[in-house]
Design a protein with these regions (language model features):
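Glycine-biased, small-residue-rich flexible motifs in mid-sequence functional cores and linkers
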Residues: 1-2, 80-189
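Short, small/acidic-rich helices and loops at N termini and domain boundaries
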Residues: 1-85
Length: 189
C-alpha cells in the first residue's frame, strides 16, 4: 500500500519543473498512490512518450520516504496540493506544484488562511530611493486588519529589504526560496 503524501512528494521530485505531467497522471488515474500501484511498466504503455515515467518506481518511493523523514527531523513539512492548508490562489494556477516545503514558527492555518499576504518583488540592484520606498511601504503594514504577511524571495535587494523591514516592524514574513529549503542563497540571508 502506498502513502498518498509520499507519492505526491515523489511526483513533485520527479516532475517538479513539469507539474502538469504530475497533475495529468493523478487526474487520469485517480490518485498519486494509484499511479505508483499501477507501476511504471503499465504507465509507459499508457503514456509512451512522457519523460520521467520510468522513474515512478518503488526505489524512488523509498528514496522519497527517507527524504521526508530527514526533512521532518529538520522541522520542514511538505504540504501536498490536496491539503486544506495549501494556498487556494496558488492552486488556481494550472501548473502549481504537487506540494510546498514549509519551515515555520507559525501554525499553517495562520500562514496560509488567516493572513492577508502581500508579495514584494523587485530588483536585486535596489537604489537608495527604491530601498526607502520599500521600507516605507512595508513599515505601513503593522496594525492592518486582517493581519498581513510579506511574501518575497530572500534575494539581495528589494526582497531582503522587505523581509528585514517586516521583521523590524513585527510583520510576519514568508520566504519563497527557489533554491530549496535546506540551502538558502545567498547564504548570509
Amino acid at each position: 500500500m502506498y502513502d498518498e503524501k509520499i507519492c505526491r512528494y515523489t511526483l513533485n521530485r520527479i516532475f517538479g519543473y513539469r507539474p502538469k505531467i504530475a497533475h495529468a497522471l493523478v487526474e487520469s488515474i485517480g490518485s498519486a498512490s494509484e499511479v505508483f500501484r499501477i507501476g511504471s511498466t503499465r504507465l509507459k504503455e499508457m503514456l509512451p512518450y512522457t519523460k520521467g515515467i520510468c522513474l515512478l518506481s518503488d526505489r524512488e518511493y523509498e528514496k522519497s520516504y527517507i527524504e521526508l523523514k530527514r526533512l521532518e527531523a529538520a522541522g520542514i513539512r511538505f504540504i501536498c496540493n490536496d491539503d486544506a492548508f495549501f494556498p487556494a490562489l496558488l492552486k488556481e494556477c494550472e501548473d502549481h506544484p504537487m506540494g510546498l516545503y514549509v519551515r515555520s514558527e507559525s501554525p499553517f492555518r495562520e500562514i496560509f488562511t488567516e493572513c492577508t499576504n502581500i508579495a514584494v518583488i523587485g530588483t536585486r540592484d535596489i537604489s537608495p530611493y527604491g530601498r526607502e520606498w520599500c521600507e516605507r511601504i512595508v513599515s505601513s503594514l503593522p496594525g492592518t486588519s486582517p493581519e498581513t504577511a510579506v511574501i518575497s524571495g530572500l534575494a539581495i535587494g528589494t526582497d531582503i529589504t522587505a523581509h528585514r523591514t517586516a521583521l523590524k516592524k513585527g510583520v510576519r514574513t514568508i520566504a519563497v526560496i527557489p533554491t530549496g529549503i535546506d540551502g538558502i542563497y545567498p547564504y548570509r540571508h
